Amino acid sequence: MSWQTYVDEHLMCEIEGLHLASTAIIGHAGTVWAQSTAFPQFKPEEITGIMKDFDEPGHLAPTGMFVAGAKYMVIQGEPGAVIRGKKGAGGITIKKTGQALVVGIYDEPMTPGQCNMVVERLGDYLLEQGL
Protein backbone atom coordinates (compact mmCIF):
# COMPACT_ATOMS: atom_id res chain seq x y z
CA MET A 1 0.00 0.00 0.00
CA SER A 2 1.36 3.44 -0.88
CA TRP A 3 1.82 6.15 1.73
CA GLN A 4 -0.73 8.26 -0.14
CA THR A 5 -3.28 5.46 0.25
CA TYR A 6 -2.74 5.52 4.03
CA VAL A 7 -3.45 9.27 3.99
CA ASP A 8 -6.45 9.07 1.66
CA GLU A 9 -8.14 5.99 3.11
CA HIS A 10 -7.05 5.83 6.75
CA LEU A 11 -6.45 9.44 7.81
CA MET A 12 -8.99 11.29 5.65
CA CYS A 13 -11.65 8.68 6.42
CA GLU A 14 -15.16 9.68 7.47
CA ILE A 15 -15.98 9.65 11.19
CA GLU A 16 -19.61 10.29 12.05
CA GLY A 17 -19.95 12.32 8.84
CA LEU A 18 -16.79 14.37 9.52
CA HIS A 19 -13.23 14.42 8.16
CA LEU A 20 -9.94 15.80 9.43
CA ALA A 21 -9.05 19.17 7.89
CA SER A 22 -5.66 17.90 6.70
CA THR A 23 -3.26 15.03 7.31
CA ALA A 24 0.22 13.83 6.42
CA ILE A 25 2.84 11.19 7.01
CA ILE A 26 6.25 12.79 7.41
CA GLY A 27 9.66 11.19 7.88
CA HIS A 28 11.60 12.04 11.04
CA ALA A 29 13.91 14.29 8.98
CA GLY A 30 10.92 16.32 7.75
CA THR A 31 10.43 14.80 4.29
CA VAL A 32 6.73 14.54 3.43
CA TRP A 33 5.92 10.97 2.40
CA ALA A 34 2.25 11.68 1.66
CA GLN A 35 -0.26 14.41 2.47
CA SER A 36 -3.80 15.58 1.92
CA THR A 37 -4.32 18.48 -0.45
CA ALA A 38 -4.85 21.12 2.27
CA PHE A 39 -1.89 20.08 4.45
CA PRO A 40 0.26 23.10 5.45
CA GLN A 41 3.98 23.28 4.69
CA PHE A 42 6.03 22.58 7.83
CA LYS A 43 9.21 24.60 8.29
CA PRO A 44 12.40 22.59 9.00
CA GLU A 45 12.81 24.19 12.44
CA GLU A 46 9.23 23.18 13.31
CA ILE A 47 10.01 19.51 12.60
CA THR A 48 13.22 19.86 14.63
CA GLY A 49 11.24 21.24 17.58
CA ILE A 50 8.63 18.48 17.34
CA MET A 51 11.29 15.76 17.20
CA LYS A 52 13.07 17.34 20.19
CA ASP A 53 9.80 17.26 22.16
CA PHE A 54 9.49 13.53 21.48
CA ASP A 55 13.05 13.07 22.81
CA GLU A 56 12.65 15.58 25.66
CA PRO A 57 8.92 15.68 26.58
CA GLY A 58 7.87 19.15 27.69
CA HIS A 59 10.33 20.98 25.40
CA LEU A 60 7.53 22.71 23.43
CA ALA A 61 5.17 23.44 26.33
CA PRO A 62 6.66 26.83 27.35
CA THR A 63 6.75 28.27 23.81
CA GLY A 64 3.98 26.38 22.03
CA MET A 65 4.26 24.26 18.92
CA PHE A 66 4.46 25.96 15.55
CA VAL A 67 3.07 24.32 12.42
CA ALA A 68 3.45 26.25 9.16
CA GLY A 69 3.87 29.38 11.28
CA ALA A 70 0.63 28.81 13.25
CA LYS A 71 1.05 28.51 17.02
CA TYR A 72 -0.61 25.63 18.85
CA MET A 73 -0.82 25.38 22.64
CA VAL A 74 0.65 22.00 23.61
CA ILE A 75 -1.82 19.96 25.64
CA GLN A 76 -1.40 16.63 27.39
CA GLY A 77 -0.16 13.89 25.10
CA GLU A 78 1.82 10.72 25.68
CA PRO A 79 5.49 11.55 26.41
CA GLY A 80 7.72 10.28 23.61
CA ALA A 81 4.77 8.93 21.59
CA VAL A 82 2.04 11.54 20.96
CA ILE A 83 2.00 15.35 20.92
CA ARG A 84 -1.35 17.13 20.95
CA GLY A 85 -1.96 20.81 20.32
CA LYS A 86 -4.92 23.19 20.43
CA LYS A 87 -5.51 26.36 18.41
CA GLY A 88 -8.87 28.10 18.60
CA ALA A 89 -11.67 25.72 17.62
CA GLY A 90 -9.26 23.15 16.22
CA GLY A 91 -6.07 21.33 16.95
CA ILE A 92 -3.44 18.81 15.94
CA THR A 93 -2.35 15.30 16.90
CA ILE A 94 1.10 13.95 16.01
CA LYS A 95 1.93 10.27 16.58
CA LYS A 96 5.56 9.18 16.32
CA THR A 97 6.37 5.79 14.81
CA GLY A 98 9.78 4.21 14.27
CA GLN A 99 10.33 6.07 11.00
CA ALA A 100 7.56 8.63 10.62
CA LEU A 101 5.25 11.21 12.14
CA VAL A 102 1.53 10.70 11.51
CA VAL A 103 -0.14 14.12 11.61
CA GLY A 104 -3.81 15.05 11.76
CA ILE A 105 -5.21 18.60 11.92
CA TYR A 106 -8.87 19.13 12.80
CA ASP A 107 -11.42 21.92 13.10
CA GLU A 108 -14.80 21.89 14.84
CA PRO A 109 -17.23 20.19 14.69
CA MET A 110 -14.70 17.32 14.75
CA THR A 111 -13.55 16.68 18.31
CA PRO A 112 -10.01 16.24 19.65
CA GLY A 113 -10.90 12.66 20.60
CA GLN A 114 -11.94 11.82 17.04
CA CYS A 115 -8.68 13.24 15.67
CA ASN A 116 -6.65 11.36 18.27
CA MET A 117 -8.42 8.10 17.41
CA VAL A 118 -7.75 8.35 13.66
CA VAL A 119 -4.10 9.45 13.95
CA GLU A 120 -3.13 7.11 16.77
CA ARG A 121 -4.85 4.10 15.22
CA LEU A 122 -2.77 4.42 12.04
CA GLY A 123 0.37 5.21 14.05
CA ASP A 124 -0.11 2.10 16.18
CA TYR A 125 -0.64 -0.01 13.04
CA LEU A 126 2.57 1.35 11.47
CA LEU A 127 4.48 0.61 14.69
CA GLU A 128 3.17 -2.97 14.61
CA GLN A 129 4.49 -3.24 11.03
CA GLY A 130 7.94 -2.08 12.12
CA LEU A 131 7.54 1.31 10.48
From Swiss-Prot:
A GO CC annotation given for this chain: cell cortex
| Cystines in this chain | 13-115
Entry PTM? Phosphorylated by MAP kinases.
**Classification via InterPro entries:** PFN, PFN_euk, PFN_sf, Profilin_CS
What superkingdom heads the lineage?
Eukaryota
Where the record places motif Involved in PIP2 interaction is: 81-97
Keywords, ordered alphabetically: Actin-binding, Allergen, Cytoplasm, Cytoskeleton, Disulfide bond, Phosphoprotein
Q: Name one GO molecular function term.
A: actin monomer binding
Q: List locations, semicolon-separated.
A: Cytoplasm, Cytoskeleton
Which protein family is named in the record? Belongs to the profilin family.
Oligomer status and interactors: Occurs in many kinds of cells as a complex with monomeric actin in a 1:1 ratio.
Q: What's the stated role of this polypeptide?
A: Binds to actin and affects the structure of the cytoskeleton. At high concentrations, profilin prevents the polymerization of actin, whereas it enhances it at low concentrations.
Q: What is this protein called?
A: Profilin-3
- Organism name: Olea europaea
